[in-house]
Amino acid sequence: MWCLLLVAFIVVANGHDFKTIYSWNYVDFDFPNESIRDSLISSGHYIPENNMPLGLQSWNDKFFITIPRWKNGVVSNLNYISKNDQSQSPKLIPYPNWETNCIDFPGSIVSIFRTKVDACDRLWGVDTGVTDILGNATVVQPVRIFVFDLKTDKVLRVYTLKDSDQTSNSFFADAVVDVDPNNCDNAHIYISDLSGYGIVVYSWAKNDSWRITHNYFHFDPLHGDYNISGYNFQWTDGVFGLSLSTPRNDGYKTLYFHAMSGITEFSVSTEVLQDATLKRSSDYHTFHVEGKKGARSQGPTSLIDTKTGIDYFTQVSKNGIACWDTSVPLDEDSFVLVAQDNTTLVFPQDISIDPLFNMLYVLSDNLPQLMFSNYDPKTRNFFLTAADLDSLTPACKKQNSKSR
């Protein structure tokens, strides 16, 4: 059924407009029964208006959606909905189960922001271990990497980051997985430390991690002022969005990265990141400036369509999605805003690609409303939208007549 629904969507999608797949006034869960739901609300363990969807990942017939514990009252952090669900506002189902998401259980998941699925059908997530982030922030667990087998819904590995991987200011909200589909043990995850200004690398084969530092990981003080949804605020978030190219001739990939509070895109070879023994001071010039994206082009996440080499970016100051064809130099002309909507794309948080149906999905959640006020449960606050990549590609390439 979900295949037919997606095919039908592709047929009717016009231009490069994003169509709403699901939307929510507030997030509800697939509780065992109404009595349990009512009890959790009465006790304050479930406060509907404090549950804000943030991370999105598409895999087969599921969308994985995270609910970070920004405030108290979040009953499950890692969840999914079925693409077979034809309701307007599907209830979220805890993944892999309720127990793993119960904050009172030993070893449970606390607060994963974004997840990634690799070519070996594994779901990766970095758990910050912090609850009530916007209130009385409390460290419940150390920072850990969770890896799930999506074929069995079992936890494959939990790895705790070392003290040397972090600073006193560290916070991890995004990552990208680099894996050889022909050798699943040859896998690395690159994790951006937005407030400690670094990248942590974890090797699956070595079961070890190390930290990379560079000046390019810092925020740009000229681009930390935001005006979104009527709220003015300042952020000092550094390196955040990460996207990977396809393999180059030497077998390695290019990692593109940018600060949340910044408009410059940078890059580095994964060969540099994967070598834990290199002297970082002598490798300064192995990092490169790709170019500037233009005014108000800040955004958390990015993702490369490996079929076309086009990098897609969330644009929080423009309520939109932009793109850049990585085969040409990056500048304000080659950085193209392909979608903008002041209702369905307000603060686009995460993006995901379904390679089977060639779709780009976006989850938007109007984060400033949670930070500085409260969501109105009588209005649509969260949107999962989608566009056919075939309709986006011409718009992304039409400006790009130059070649590298």
Task: For every predicted segment, state its role.
Residues N25-H45, Q88-G107, K154-S170, S209-Q234, ...:
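Surface-exposed loop and turn segments in beta-propeller and other repeat-based domains
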Residues Y46-N60, D104-V126, S164-I189, F219-T254, ...:
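Beta-rich, blade/repeat-based domains predominating
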